[in-house]
Regions:
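Short SAM/SAH-binding signature in class I
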Residues: 95-101
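Conserved Class I SAM-dependent methyltransferase catalytic core
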Residues: 50-52, 56, 60-65, 69, ...
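Residues immediately flanking
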Residues: 86, 102, 138-139
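RNA-binding accessory domains that recognize and position tRNA/RNA substrates
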Residues: 187-189
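Conserved S-adenosyl-L-methionine
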Residues: 1-90, 106-107, 111-113
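Conserved catalytic network of the ASCE P-loop NTPase/AAA+ motor domain
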Residues: 90-92, 127-128
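Cys/His Zn-binding finger modules involved in RNA regulation
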Residues: 183-185
């Protein structure tokens, strides 16, 4: 769901725009009010926004579910999903960010493999030194295995399970003025 939510934010798409709610059947709010609200939310979507949202997983069944959910959200043409091991992650982009919810290793038998995954993430992500990373996990020693202390850490709950959002901030990309943007647009043609 992270790539789907990222695309919705990038397109300025209201959450739940494609869903129905019990409140839509309340007698004291007419159907017209809900229709008008949906129409207004739809008019605010930026359909031509340039997005580069990608989702990776080593589990093909997880990717299949993600593709189905992207289609249900009307975003199948805005997202790219691919089966890929974390070891293969790279990018030519100088700036970007990664939001990930890796396995937590809640079962004792998974603990060692998850800790190995966190070490591998630390190695791979360190090569993307101008990127920012946002990692959600319940593992209390995540930073030790990742090899770096987070710039910020926020407590979250995934249902009843306490997790933490570890935030690692990269540098901000340089600002481009309108002249540079126009120049780049000409070069890209």
């Amino acid at each position: 769901t992270i790539p789907i939510e990222a695309a919705m934010i990038g397109l300025n798409m209201a959450p739940g725009i494609n869903r129905s709610f019990v409140s839509g059947n309340w007698r004291w709010i007419t159907k017209n009010v809900w229709d008008k609200a949906r129409e207004e939310a739809g008019s605010l979507i930026i359909n031509d926004a340039e997005l580069n949202v990608q989702g990776y997983d080593i589990d093909e069944s997880a990717l299949k579910v993600a593709r189905i959910n992207a289609k249900l959200a009307g975003l199948e043409n805005k997202l790219h999903f691919q089966k890929r091991d974390i070891k293969e992650l790279s990018s030519k982009d100088h700036y970007g960010f990664i939001v990930t919810n890796p396995p937590y290793g809640e079962r004792l038998s998974d603990q060692k493999s998850v800790e190995g995954l966190y070490k591998e993430m630390g190695k791979v992500f360190s090569k993307l030194d101008t990127w920012s990373f946002y990692i959600i996990t319940s593992h209390e020693e995540f930073e030790r295995f990742f090899g770096r202390r987070a710039d910020k850490k926020r407590k979250l709950y995934n249902g009843m399970m306490r997790t933490d959002l570890y935030q690692f901030f990269g540098p901000k990309p340089p600002k481009r003025n309108n002249y540079e943007s126009a120049e780049l647009s000409e070069i890209e043609k």
